[in-house]
């Protein structure tokens, strides 16, 4: 897992670099989902082709929590969809890398997202269309736990179970924080695993920073065709990897200063080196 640890660290470093360069963005929730994206794009879970993003039979990924676009852009760049150097154009005039993903501009982005609550509906519609057409391909959507306060999420959950969309997996980035503070204090969705089960979903829980475990559970969901959509509750830490950002709601949407960036990058590299030595 040493190589994927390196990839996840590279994603986190680039997330911070591009947000610092743009002086705007969402580091907390981007850092919390970096290991999930590493597992999907580099762990052999997603069937995809950077040279042919619209390949027939591909798997589909939707970033429902579109404000974490820096994490998706970093993953796509390192996977080969566009040059890594382009990451530094985040949020700049004329860039393909908008503050939230734009499918008309950025290769590898399946749909424009950022309006919270809509991503799972789009994923469910895609999964339903694939099933009706008898086409290959699994569909994955990454949601925030704060996003699950949106009622549309539960309409999509009900529809997905009713249509037996077992080609659909919803991954919940369960970091416990949103822009205004703790999810449980803003508008608690209660136990999300119990809730998805009540809607007729197959539910699995995983450490959202354990890449081996993530790959195992995501592949298990992908291979399971038992008539139920799949929900993966990934326990994560907002701002993961940077001690002064971890579990701090204030880092939901704030760019680091030059000094903070330097400290964060040094901490991430030191942790990666330690992990490699242990491995």
Language-model regions, residue ranges each:
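Generic structural signal for well-ordered, non-membrane alpha-helical segments
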Residues: 1-4, 8, 12, 29-34, ...
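N-terminal amphipathic, basic-rich helices that act as targeting or association modules
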Residues: 1-69
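Glycine-rich ThDP/TPP pyrophosphate-binding loop and its adjacent helix/strand module
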Residues: 47-54, 58-60, 100-279
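Active-site catalytic microenvironments for nucleophilic, acid-base chemistry
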Residues: 39-44, 78-79, 159
């Amino acid at each position: 897992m040493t190589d994927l640890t390196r990839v996840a660290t590279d994603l986190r470093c680039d997330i911070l670099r591009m947000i610092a360069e743009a002086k705007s963005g969402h580091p907390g929730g981007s850092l919390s989902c970096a290991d999930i994206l590493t597992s999907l794009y580099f762990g052999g879970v997603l069937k995809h082709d950077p040279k042919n993003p619209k390949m027939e039979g591909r798997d589909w990924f939707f970033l429902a929590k579109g404000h974490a676009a820096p994490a998706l852009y970093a993953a796509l760049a390192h996977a080969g969809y566009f040059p890594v150097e382009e990451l530094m154009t985040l949020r700049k005039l004329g860039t393909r890398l908008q503050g939230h993903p734009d499918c008309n501009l950025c290769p590898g982005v399946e749909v424009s997202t950022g309006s919270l609550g809509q991503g799972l509906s789009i994923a469910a519609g895609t999964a339903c269309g694939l099933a009706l057409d008898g086409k290959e391909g699994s569909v994955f959507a990454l949601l925030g736990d704060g996003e699950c306060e949106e009622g549309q999420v539960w309409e999509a959950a009900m529809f997905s179970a009713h249509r037996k969309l077992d080609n659909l997996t919803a991954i919940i980035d369960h970091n416990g924080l949103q822009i205004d503070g703790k999810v449980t204090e803003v508008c608690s969705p209660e136990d999300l695993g119990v809730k998805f089960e009540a809607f007729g979903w197959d539910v699995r829980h995983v450490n959202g920073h354990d890449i081996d475990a993530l790959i195992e559970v995501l592949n298990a969901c992908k291979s399971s065709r038992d008539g139920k959509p799949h929900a993966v509750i990934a326990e994560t830490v907002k701002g993961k990897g940077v001690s002064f950002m971890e579990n701090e709601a204030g880092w939901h949407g704030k760019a680091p200063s030059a000094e903070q960036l330097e400290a964060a990058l040094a901490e991430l590299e030191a942790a990666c080196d330690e992990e490699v030595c242990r491995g």
